[in-house]
Amino acid sequence: MCGYYGNYYGGRGYGCCGYGGLGYGYGGLGCGLGSYYGCGYRRLGCGYGCGYGYGYGSRSLCGCGYGYGSGYGSGFGYYY
């Protein structure tokens, strides 16, 4: 749910932006534009090199803590 519904629809209230990948706006950085392309937990750098339709998050790319994917809905257990 997180990847597809969270990021494809912008991550607002759908489960992928900010605090623990639930809700939205915790810390605010990267939410909206960031979470639309990127992933959830880490609020810094999400959307800039993480996801962008590739389907997987990566801490090495953008520091997304739990590796929530992109609009494709991939990446629940991918903790890189």
UniProtKB/Swiss-Prot annotation:
Keywords: Keratin. The lineage of its organism: Eukaryota, Metazoa, Chordata, Craniata, Vertebrata. Belongs to the KRTAP type 6 family. One of its GO terms (biological process) is keratinization. Interacts with hair keratins. In the hair cortex, hair keratin intermediate filaments are embedded in an interfilamentous matrix, consisting of hair keratin-associated proteins (KRTAP), which are essential for the formation of a rigid and resistant hair shaft through their extensive disulfide bond cross-linking with abundant cysteine residues of hair keratins. The matrix proteins include the high-sulfur and high-glycine-tyrosine keratins. The keyword Acyltransferase does not apply. The keyword Nucleotide-binding does not apply. This is Keratin-associated protein 6-1. GO terms for cellular component: intermediate filament.
